[in-house]
Amino acid sequence: MSDLSHIRNFSIIAHIDHGKSTLADRFIQMCGGLTEREMEAQVLDSMDLERERGITIKAHSVTLYYKAKDGITYQLNFIDTPGHVDFTYEVSRSLAACEGALLVVDAGQGVEAQSVANCYTAIEQGLEVMPVLNKMDLPQADPDRVKEEIEKIIGIDATDAVACSAKSGMGVDEVLERLVATIPAPTGNIEDPLQALIIDSWFDNYLGVVSLVRVRHGRVKKGDKILVKSTGKLHLVDSVGVFNPKHSATVDLKAGEVGFIIAGIKDIHGAPVGDTLTLSTTPDVDVLPGFKRIQPQVYAGLFPVSSDDFEDFREALQKLTLNDSSLQYLPESSDALGFGFRCGFLGMLHMEIIQERLEREYNLDLITTAPTVIFELLLKTGETIYVDNPSKLPDLSAIEDMREPIVRANILVPQEHLGNVITLCIEKRGVQHDMLFLGTQVQVSYDLPMNEVVLDFFDRLKSVSRGYASLDYHFDRYQSANLVKLDVLINAEKVDALALIVHRDNAHYKGRALTEKMKELIPRQMFDVAIQAAIGGQIVARTTVKALRKNVLAKCYGGDVSRKRKLLEKQKAGKKRMKQVGNVEIPQEAFLAVLRLE
């Protein structure tokens, strides 16, 4: 099908749980992509993790052939996008390959902050956005209110939004018809030199690097020599094709199409995402505007439990970085935990997902330290440095000013939960920016310290609003704050992996809470274990894990008191000696205790 006017490239924008993966399943079923037997729920969420959590993490693509009512068969290239705030860069990658997007909104819940953010991204990239109301079969569906919300909050016309229910299949054909009519066809010239954008790439143990590309101009077929613009290397194409949703090889990929290219690239970083491909005969094709590198917001140390796994761990991280360009890592060593990596993530969910993927897909046992954000420090010498690890913090006497990252958070919440949300934001040292009443929902925007957001803000927000509030945030600026480093000492030895950077006002409270928590988690030893929290040289909190004691007098029946005293003295001497040489094993839960401080 070479006619460009019959191709439609689109993606779906939706908040978590508004039914985009189910809608995708319906599309695949209606266009006959899979037989009844192969149909299973959430076909595109291929990672077990995605299925379990019910979220889409990676972008996927599917090519479907839809015979419309006007008798023309259209090629629909559908690129699935994640909906969670941590994966916004995946969304911008998917959108860069499309001409249009379906904005799917749950007719019961209404517009959520996430869809608003992604929708703006789509509009900025010049895409045609088409609203769809999903879950119309639910009793609480209220299409008129939701249409009004779409118009008020996002500002696109929703008077003729298509109503459907992906679960029952009602109105899905109407969605496809409208899609073919409203979303523009791709532009591009098949005769021009090849120019293709890499949307995603992943590593296959047999095939090497598999790249998902959107061809802008020209064509590419098996046996072509392609040039990767950023590395300048040449590769021979082994096969090209599309996913429908299974791998299907095709003769070639032409302008306007989305598909995969396998070129036997063995080097993991041989085809970076956002790069441009062209033929070796036309090396001077312009580079397409790629995606911007996203800066990680949250850093945490990851350490293998057994130090023999270090090399496997490094390899696993390399493979994951290919598929997930926002993950960054640097080697790090800790006195308590040995060698590992300091990894940068986009947010807490991203961190959990990466850790689970490492443990599942690469069978590693990992210990994670508490996450921190990047702080900007102005030293007395006048230079500015950035610190992402509390144990790397220079001495307080050398620091002129400490600045913490502030994020601008947009929260959409139903009016009845507004009070709780405001209380939570104040507790997290937030400063209110503005408040808009939009029908039954309220949009509040706050400036919050990122340090407070990364720990448990999202979970707390969900619980105070009974799951109705939705959050979208982005980094805004660095701002001076009175911050201190809180060290944890176990038996008078600092444990570097447990250090935290906190606001001075919260330091005593945090120190107390942390030592109490550690007391529960550190197993009792044969001697007393002192757990202390200190700021510099000043101890702000202390608890003691009491010793286990063997009753050495059990074998004495009567007899002289000096015999008993001798045994007790002997035990005392043994305990004293033990305390000098004994070391305390700190369990994995203790390192994460920091996260669960109320």
Curated annotation (Swiss-Prot):
tr-type G domain span: 5-187
Membrane topology: Peripheral membrane protein
Catalytic activity: GTP + H2O = GDP + phosphate + H(+)
InterPro entries: EF-4, EFG_III/V, EFG_V-like, EFTu-like_2, LepA_C_sf, LepA_CTD, LepA_IV, P-loop_NTPase
Binding site for GTP: 17-22, 134-137
Localisation per UniProt entry: Cell inner membrane
GO cellular component, as recorded: plasma membrane
Biological processes annotated in GO: positive regulation of translation
Superkingdom of origin organism: Bacteria
Gene Ontology molecular function: any one: GTPase activity
Pfam families named among the record's database cross-references: EFG_C, GTP_EFTU, GTP_EFTU_D2, LepA_C
Cross-referenced HAMAP family: LepA
Described function: Required for accurate and efficient protein synthesis under certain stress conditions. May act as a fidelity factor of the translation reaction, by catalyzing a one-codon backward translocation of tRNAs on improperly translocated ribosomes. Back-translocation proceeds from a post-translocation (POST) complex to a pre-translocation (PRE) complex, thus giving elongation factor G a second chance to translocate the tRNAs correctly. Binds to ribosomes in a GTP-dependent manner.
Protein name: Elongation factor 4
Organism: Pseudomonas syringae pv. syringae (strain B728a)
